[in-house]
């Protein structure tokens, strides 16, 4: 016989029982927003690159980052293309830096927008080029309200596409058993 009920056990203790949806509603504390940014236009990239030489050394890049603390923080996140190029080559191509610079500006604007909707518990889970993933507190905004706001503001914020989903059972298991 098939069953629709699940249980989560850890160290011999049954921690929760219910259908997958019941467990997600009871223990899932966040929703996940995954989005793809609209690629930068050649005009926008050219405008940013006008003030740069074709390659920039680490000291020049670090001086530029000092002007915006959120960009400096983004530089130290895993898989930052600018940091990786500097570590491997000692310099970064202006085109790579310009594209990253503009992507970070869009991502930061989206993060601030989400915080205005759902509060300060909005968390950037990762960013990798055009792809960004945020965790949103479930209590901040209903799903229909969130979709309405995303639809109304996606063009202005430079989003090409997005998805919103509940926490996965694996994420819930990990949070319950920690």
Where do the protein language model's features map onto the residues?
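Phosphate-coordinating loops and pocket residues in cytosolic domains that bind phosphorylated ligands
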Residues: 25
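ABC ATPase "signature
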Residues: 17-18
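Short, charged/small-residue-rich alpha-helical element at the C-terminal edge
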Residues: 32-171, 175-176
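Conserved catalytic segment of ABC-fold P-loop ATPases
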Residues: 1-8, 21-22
């Amino acid at each position: 016989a098939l069953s629709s009920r699940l249980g989560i056990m850890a160290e011999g203790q049954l921690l929760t029982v219910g259908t997958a949806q019941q467990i997600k509603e009871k223990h899932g504390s966040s929703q996940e927003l995954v989005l793809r940014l609209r690629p930068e236009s050649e005009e926008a990239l050219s405008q940013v690159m006008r003030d740069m030489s074709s390659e920039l050394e680490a000291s020049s890049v670090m001086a530029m980052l000092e002007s915006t603390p959120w960009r400096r923080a983004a530089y130290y996140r895993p898989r930052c293309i600018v940091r990786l190029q500097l570590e491997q080559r000692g310099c970064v191509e202006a085109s790579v830096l310009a594209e990253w610079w503009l992507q970070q500006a869009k991502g930061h604007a989206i993060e601030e927008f989400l915080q205005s909707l759902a509060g300060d518990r909005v968390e950037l889970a990762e960013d990798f080029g055009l792809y960004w993933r945020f965790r949103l507190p479930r209590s901040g905004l209903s799903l229909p309200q969130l979709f309405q706001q995303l639809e109304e503001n996606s063009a202005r914020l430079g989003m090409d596409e997005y998805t919103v989903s509940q926490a996965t059972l694996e994420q819930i298991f990990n949070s319950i058993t920690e």
